[in-house]
């Protein structure tokens, strides 16, 4: 048996996955024969066989190119969609297999808890000496907050998400070993129905989504998935604590959610004060509607009659107060429910929620009032033999109210520093504002930021737009409460003047509380390598500024800093980005501690490794000691949201993993490693020389022309994927002006994945040449940061394909001979040292399940990529005007994304 096929060996626990993949693959074949033709299915089989043979012999893709070249756009699109449909069912099968494995762990009992879950985390903590008292003291400090962001390369439509959930549900039902043959046939029919409907649904919308569309998309995950699983998360934690320690303390809220959709103005002219207000209103309606529906369901359960059981005096008193508060609603109560106090109170609680929606008399002033009502019901049920008569359902609703409040998710607002600077310069009439250094600007801004002098108002678009934003935030704080608002993030923050500028603008916009303070958490986002290096100085200057320190005192002496993984990688390469982020956290923590401020980090991670993606548990294990301290705030983007939160069971697993990782990192951080003092200079050298190689490549003359020819970036820019443009508005096509997401997406499509590894080999070679090979091996063995870094690079390399990348590169004409040899040589150097330092014969040798997943997909991605190159060449020959070819190319982009499970 050849090497390729012999490597596709499923471990015993994964044999059910193999069976599912085979069964669903056959179902895809039936679908293609029915929806297109038997001849089309035969053609797909011929292409598939050729692709597998190429992989087995490690041959160049020329045989595939000959077979696929010159197809009519409609035929090409159908072929691509056929392979994409295979990826769709394989991805679903793998997700359902994760559910299967989770159930197997749960059935086996707590002697073998699932790795990285809550049971596993608590058992490890107890083994390290953490007592129940210590755990109880830490729990109120735990704050885990995934923040959902709009993603300009998200390639999954809402209509397809819903059908995917139907397919998942049918497979999950089929896991039940008690299903009858008829029931299994029904499951298969449901799957086939959803799959066929998906085939008949276009992969992409013909129009660019609006901010409202993006908000609805994120709202789907919040209201349809996470709303359902939040109570289960807390129940799982209680069970894990009881199993580990024997008793359970009262649990505080540990989880909440944030969003950027509707508030991220950076480079997006479609986001403004109106979308901020509209988003907050829409989220309020969505979550209050869920509460009303759940209370309605609860009412039918809480039908206890006072002729049979008692209720608490506190509940009776509350019922009387509500009758007086809402006489019209009380009058509508049905007489036959007169002996059912829980149901009567429930009716009036729903009436109060409706009044809250309508801003009418009798509205709840805050979520805490609804929590109080639910707690009254719980206490009364517990005191009157009702633990098994509705208490469980009422408690689940209470956990939801604690988690989602009346706002569903906290809304962040983000804008670039230069936008604020231009507005202030215009307001002050200072044409040389940019020429002044940060100290000079801070001195000018001080009186305005402190509220001593009003910042002048001027009648121009930039100032009016910002005034409207801060006025909207002030109104939102009054209407929705402080909990509805997250942070104000300054992208491309460079110095303290950038922060003081926002403080001054907020005051002018009316965002001031009764005490005269600005009730806003202002968060600088350090994105470039240089800004990460200078971030410590910026924060030190900021915390030493008396005006800002007074503002911070009103915010609890807690400062948040956001770390940008995307632009730092685009700027200096992945090695410099990762090391710069690591060093920045250490230095920022030390600076904040010296000045008596608690510093928390907001991690701006993306889906790909090049943008900070990867497992949260491993990332936190590799993070600097003390950098978590009970809190995790991290962006969740695009396909990451889909992958982690698209299915309820996997969403629950994701929340458990994050919470468990935060508990482990906070309660028992790694002991200080004295060898790090010796390792850091070596990593400095790796990062420095890696950056030199990376910048020499991307900074070479005509590189941007090469990039635009050797990747499908021009197709991506034409796709209707998000409301935000791929380049910063009004700027040219230079690399610095291209956003990180399409940069990574384009290289991922071309299968070169440059942002995820380029320069690493040169950096490692430089360290070896300097005599540090044994130190590097020691670092790979014993330093979680470095080991995780190498593992991530190995994963990226495994998803790339040099042969396919060469096909794309040849589209650049003469530039191919200049740039592709650099890619080939750096790839060989990087791959060689990564394998050597990880002591592996092949990439991902330590993770056979991931390796199998990638190898399973590659032969099916290859035909799409080869076809993409052919179509791209033909489309460009029409100056990008052939819409049929463009549609086929868009199908290719979606297909490759499904296959590699990665966009930007």
From Swiss-Prot:
Any single GO molecular-function term of the entry would be: phosphoenolpyruvate carboxylase activity
Question: Reaction(s) catalyzed by this protein?
Answer: oxaloacetate + phosphate = phosphoenolpyruvate + hydrogencarbonate
Give disulfide pairs as residue numbers. Answer: none
| Top-tier EC class | lyase
Which Enzyme Commission number(s) are on file for it? 4.1.1.31
Q: Which residues form the active site?
A: 151, 570
Q: What are the names of the required cofactors?
A: Mg(2+)
Job description of the protein: Forms oxaloacetate, a four-carbon dicarboxylic acid source for the tricarboxylic acid cycle.
Name under which the protein is recorded: Phosphoenolpyruvate carboxylase
Q: Which organism is it from?
A: Xanthomonas axonopodis pv. citri (strain 306)
- This protein's encoding gene: ppc
């Amino acid at each position: 048996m050849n090497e390729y096929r012999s490597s596709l060996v499923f471990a015993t626990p994964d044999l059910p996955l193999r069976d599912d993949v085979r069964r669903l693959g056959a179902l895809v074949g039936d679908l293609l024969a029915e929806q297109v033709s038997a001849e089309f299915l035969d053609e797909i089989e011929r292409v598939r066989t050729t692709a597998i043979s190429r992989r087995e012999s490690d041959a160049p893709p020329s045989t595939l190119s000959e077979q696929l070249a010159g197809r009519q756009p409609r035929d090409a699109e159908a072929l691509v969609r056929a392979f994409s449909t295979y990826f769709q069912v394989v991805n679903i099968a793998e997700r359902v297999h994760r559910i299967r494995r989770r159930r197997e762990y749960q059935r086996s009992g707590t002697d073998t808890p699932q790795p990285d879950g809550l049971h596993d985390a608590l058992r490890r903590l107890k083994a390290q000496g953490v007592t129940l008292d210590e755990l109880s003291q830490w729990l109120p400090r735990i704050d885990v907050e995934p923040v959902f962001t709009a993603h300009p390369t998200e390639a999954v439509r809402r209509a397809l998400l819903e059908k995917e959930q139907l397919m998942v549900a049918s497979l999950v039902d089929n896991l039940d070993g008690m299903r009858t043959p008829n029931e299994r046939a029904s499951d298969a029919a449901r799957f086939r129905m959803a799959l066929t409907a998906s085939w008949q649904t276009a992969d992409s919308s013909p129009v660019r989504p609006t901010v409202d569309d993006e908000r609805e998309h994120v709202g789907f995950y919040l209201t349809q998935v996470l709303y359902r699983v939040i109570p289960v998360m807390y129940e799982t934690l209680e069970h894990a604590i009881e199993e580990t320690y024997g008793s359970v303390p009262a649990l505080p809220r540990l989880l909440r959610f944030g969003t950027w959709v509707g508030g991220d103005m950076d480079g997006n002219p479609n986001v403004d004060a109106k979308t901020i207000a509209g988003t907050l209103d829409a989220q309020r309606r969505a979550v209050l509607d869920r509460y009303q529906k759940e209370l309605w369901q609860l009412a039918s359960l809480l039908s206890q009659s006072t002729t049979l059981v008692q209720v608490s005096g506190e509940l009776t008193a509350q019922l009387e107060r509500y009758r007086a508060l809402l006489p019209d609603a009380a009058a509508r109560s049905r007489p036959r429910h007169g002996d059912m106090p829980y149901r009567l109170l429930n009716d009036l609680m729903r009436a109060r929620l409706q009044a809250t929606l309508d801003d009418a008399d009798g509205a709840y002033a805050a979520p805490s009032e609804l929590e109080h009502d639910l707690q009254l019901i719980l206490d009364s049920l517990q005191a009157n033999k009702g633990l098994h008569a509705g208490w469980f359902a009422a408690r689940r609703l209470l956990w939801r109210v604690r988690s989602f409040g009346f706002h569903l998710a906290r809304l962040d607002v983000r804008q670039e520093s230069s936008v604020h600077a231009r507005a202030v310069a215009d307001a002050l009439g200072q044409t040389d504002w940019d020429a002044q250094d940060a100290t000079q600007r801070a001195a000018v801004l001080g009186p305005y930021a402190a509220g001593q002098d009003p910042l002048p108002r001027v009648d121009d678009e930039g100032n009016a737009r910002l005034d409207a934003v801060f006025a909207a935030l002030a109104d939102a704080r009054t209407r929705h409460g402080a909990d509805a608002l997250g942070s104000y993030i300054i992208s491309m923050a460079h110095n303290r003047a950038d922060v003081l500028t926002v403080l001054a603008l907020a005051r002018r916009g009316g965002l001031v509380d009764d005490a005269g303070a600005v009730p806003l958490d202002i968060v600088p986002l350090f994105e470039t390598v240089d800004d990460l290096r200078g971030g410590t100085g910026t924060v030190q200057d900021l915390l030493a500024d008396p005006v800002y320190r007074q503002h911070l005192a009103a915010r609890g002496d807690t400062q948040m800093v956001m770390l940008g993984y995307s632009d730092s990688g685009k700027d200096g390469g992945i090695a410099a980005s990762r090391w710069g982020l690591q060093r920045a956290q250490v230095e920022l923590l030390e600076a904040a501690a010296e000045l008596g401020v608690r510093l928390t980090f907001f991690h701006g991670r993306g889906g790909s490794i090049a943008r900070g993606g990867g497992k949260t548990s491993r990332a936190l294990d590799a993070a600097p000691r003390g950098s978590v301290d009970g809190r995790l705030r991290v962006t969740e983007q695009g396909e990451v949201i889909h992958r982690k939160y698209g299915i309820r069971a996997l969403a629950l697993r994701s929340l458990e993993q994050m919470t468990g990782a935060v508990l482990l990192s906070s309660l028992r951080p790694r002991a200080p490693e004295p060898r790090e003092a010796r390792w850091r200079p070596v990593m400095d050298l790796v990062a420095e020389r890696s950056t030199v190689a990376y910048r020499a490549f991307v900074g070479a003359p005509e590189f941007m022309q090469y990039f635009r020819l050797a990747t499908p970036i021009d197709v991506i820019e034409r796709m209707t994927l998000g409301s935000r443009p791929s380049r910063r508005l009004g700027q040219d096509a230079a690399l610095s002006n291209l956003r990180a997401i399409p940069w990574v997406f384009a290289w991922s499509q071309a299968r070169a994945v440059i942002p995820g590894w380029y320069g690493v080999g040169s950096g490692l070679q430089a360290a070896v040449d300097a005599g540090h090979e044994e130190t590097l091996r020691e670092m790979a063995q014993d330093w979680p940061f470095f080991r995780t870094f190498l593992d991530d690079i190995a994963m990226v390399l495994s998803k790339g394909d040099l042969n396919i990348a060469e096909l794309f590169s040849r589209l650049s004409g003469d530039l191919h001979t200049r740039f592709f040899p650099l890619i080939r040589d750096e790839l060989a150097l990087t791959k060689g040292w990564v394998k050597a330092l990880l002591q592996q014969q092949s990439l991902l040798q330590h993770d056979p399940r991931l390796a199998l997943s990638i190898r399973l997909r590659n032969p099916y991605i290859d035909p799409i990529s080869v076809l993409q190159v052919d179509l791209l060449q033909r489309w460009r020959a029409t100056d990008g005007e052939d819409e049929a070819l463009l549609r086929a190319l868009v199908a290719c982009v979606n297909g490759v994304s499904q296959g590699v499970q990665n966009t930007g």
